[in-house]
Amino acid sequence: MPSYFRRAAVQHALGSVSSYQTRLEQWKAEGQKKGKPYLESKQYAMPVFYHDVMYRKNTEEKDAAFLKLYDGRGWKWFAVRLKHTDMEYLRKHWSGKKASAPTLEKKHDKYFLRFTYAEEVSLNRTPVKEQTICSVDLGINTDAVCTIMRPDGTILGRKFINFSSDKDRMYRVLGRIRRFQREHGSRQAQGRWAYAKRLNTELGRKIAREIVLYASEKKADVIVFEYLEMKGKLSGKKKQKLQMWRKRDIQKRCGQQAHRKGIRISRICAWNTSRLAFDGSGEIARDTRDHRLCTFQTGKRYNCDLSASYNIGARYFIREILKPLPATERSLLEAKVPAVKRRTSCVYADLRELISEMELRKAA
């Protein structure tokens, strides 16, 4: 085995041990009794093809490269053809960026070369009073509802993101799996479940791309999501689990794509964002036939996910406005607007009331 492969294996082992020691120290510092981290001995590390010694570009062909591989007798250079569309994507989006050594990757019993690039990006430092945010509600009936909001509660734009055909395809696959499992059992349906998960992952990619694209078009400084509990096992039907996994994947992908554009990511408490009406009238009543719509206690008909996106953006600004204030000034504002004390029940109407109260205090 070449020394370069041995060096990569040693570096991977050092990184795994260092990560384990860090997690163990954090676990001891928190004083927890359960969830003690452990060192996984089987890492399944893939080899790294270092430049010039294990990997070389093909100067004669654009979509080809040379890899040093073992043919049973010795290590020799072999020409490998790369997919034209993948190489065009790299040339279009990553030309001029610092490229790291490619790594071998195995997915679905196939091997791929994973190319990694390094890029320095500075996140924006826009003050809260000048920020424009994109609050996102990841729903069930509608994939995502985005609202562009200013600190005073002004709504600059709204967008409904929904890939209905992709969801219908996935739900048809789930229906076939359910009928198949009734006849043959769940053990023989693993391949079908893997296909459903791949459809779910692809749907998450599309939704995340649309969210970041819309936030970038509207020049948003922050994308605000609900905080989703990421620990523990998920209970419920497999369909519900797929929806939760997709929401987690969307938030993760949005964070990665938004940071490349200098956009920050923030999360707020998810309690009651969909249950409470944005106008402060109280709990909503969802329609039994069309779950996208609801009725406020005032009799107003509105979209549930759009109301939730208003509340998500309002909670972000309430938190960011009150957090840097001195304790005395914050207490006076909370006395005038008692609803902002509990972040689990704040709605869009409370933000408007808080802003008006702050303006009155400035005028006085």
Annotated model-derived regions:
Residues 1-364:
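Nucleic-acid substrate recognition interfaces
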